[in-house]
Amino acid sequence: MGELKLINIDKETNYDEWLAFRTNGLGASDIGTLMGLNPYKSKIELFYQKLGLIPIKQDENIPMFYGNRLEEFVANMWEYYDGEDPESVIRNYAAGTKIRICKPITGYITNSDYPHLFLSPDRVMVSKETDKIVYGGKLVNKNFTGVLEVKTINGFASKQWEGGIPPSYVTQLQTYLFGLELEYGEIVFLEDGRKLWTIPMELNLNLRDKIVSEMNEFMHRIDAAKADIENVQMYEPEPDGTEAFEKFLNTKYADSESKTLQGSDDMFQIAVRHKVLAGEIKEMESQHRECSNLLKNHMKEHESLD
């Protein structure tokens, strides 16, 4: 077992120290990006942020703004939720009956077994209200029984994900579990501002190993790039198939020049495959559109087939 430590850095009063700490490691919320699961941010963007070559975005969007301010409320309501019936929150809250207990931790947690990782879970679970989680500036992690991650979610948007949640939420919670050396955690959701539900999760050792492998490989790139910053492009993560990676490259190379690059055999094969796939996609889209039109023409004003 690794040694867990609590590190307190006040972003508001010591921004430079906070920024240096953040850029020298990975947080649990970075893991989805690292694994190619974040539709809004690419691994290559994370790479340049950790090198300090592009800024870490600090501006809150509307979901982040309300999510941050609702975190305490949702965590408090989780304590009254029986895990099955959303209306149990109302009954237990009215009766003053807490089903389980969670507590916030101020600061970042590090684990000596994972030196590149820093953790800031929304809440940790404890058995009793009187259980301390920090004493004398040190963690009392023997009292941790689980970890709780709090999310607000739009019901319509959640339908695009298998299981109703973005896969990056899963990797985030799993990272908290192995980083805090816990076996159990939950994600609690407030859906559309009115429905509370949870997804319980146990530590997945296979996923842990994949995450740790990706972390180590990524941080090796970071360390190598810092030592050879003039040749930073040599250490960039390899392109993947995510739209976020495509968007980053389009922005980076927006100002192209009318020059020809001598290609290799590998690049030629990639270009051929790109052309073949583009043709297949176009044909599939045409077939999909034809099927859609046939169905619409057959069903007319009806909404479903029996």
Language model regions located:
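Accessory terminal regions of nucleic-acid processing enzymes
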Residues: 1-306
